[in-house]
Amino acid sequence: LMKKVLFVGLLACVALSTAAKKKLAITMTGENLATLTQVTDNQEPCLDPFGGDNGSALFFSVRENGKYFNIYKKDNPFSAAMSQKTSGKNNNRTPCYNPATGKIAFSCRQDGASSADIYTMFDSKGKALSQITESTDAFEEYPSFNKEGNLLVYDKIQRSYYSKANFASFFGFGYSTIVVENSEIWLRNLKTGENVLLGNGYQPCFSPDGKRIAYVKYSSDAKSTSIWIMNIDGSEQVQLTDAKKGFALNPRWSPDGTRLVFQSSKKDKKDADLYVIDVDGNNLTQLTINKSYDGQPYWTTDGYIYFVSDRGNNVGNYQIWRFKYE
């Protein structure tokens, strides 16, 4: 298998064109985010925002003691209080929440473990966990629920496909490079326990109607990543973006399912910006233009985009921000 280079953590992604191989003009009007607001102001980085729809709970991960990560929740995005949902010397990352079931799903790499698994827990029942996947030689991460909460999609990367020199940094923090030969997207039926392999890819995300999945895939030359969509049975895989010298990561759906927001940067840059594209590959628009890292977006049902950034005076200390986008 051809090796693929993945910049993990906060290094992101790309310059683009479309699935139809036609050149796309990028709309760039300059950063004009009148509603831009900082949501967290923590001494340590806050990552992986999920939620905040119509002022509801916001879930995210927080680095602790410069090493570990745990999942936290704000009942209101702008409340000062944060409740801790996970604990211990683990790396608990990429939370997602399903309102229909009241469950949180996240990826956990326990201290000293050489793998990571998907866990779920009821938001209202504290820290009682249910282990969904069980692997001793793979990283399983980026869970995403369908609307009903009975299906969970996630990615899986075999432990042997990582560069041993960089393995320790995968669920850590920073710009470390990890060599990946293959990543897979799996669909789990939470009622029956059935697992189905959908194909190769990374960072899957269910569409609002539960009929499609957005995800990241490597180019054939292994020098870039692009955004794709497919049906939930793995059929009709369509490429939306094409980056020859960069990376596109973290696709998230608009509330109506017609657009995707994602982060993008050239591979020789540590900064990243946010972009929006229609699901037919048209109307690529750059949202942020900043020398900081702007990534890990989440698009709420009331039109806000939450994202992670070290802009302003927070260079190196990544916090959660949001702005209104219709």
What are the roles of these predicted feature ranges?
Residues 50-52, 96, 144, 205, ...:
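Conserved beta-strand position repeated across blades of beta-propeller domains
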Residues 41-44, 61-72, 86-91, 107-119, ...:
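A flexible loop/linker signature enriched in serine peptidases of the S9 family
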Residues 53-54, 99-100, 147-148, 208-209, ...:
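Residue-level detector of Asp-centered blade-edge/turn motifs that repeat once per structural unit
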Residues 11-18:
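Hydrophobic h-region of N-terminal signal peptides that target proteins for export
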Residues 2-5:
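Positively charged n-region of N-terminal signal peptides that target proteins for export
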Residues 22-45, 74-91, 121-139, 180, ...:
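Multi-bladed beta-propeller domains
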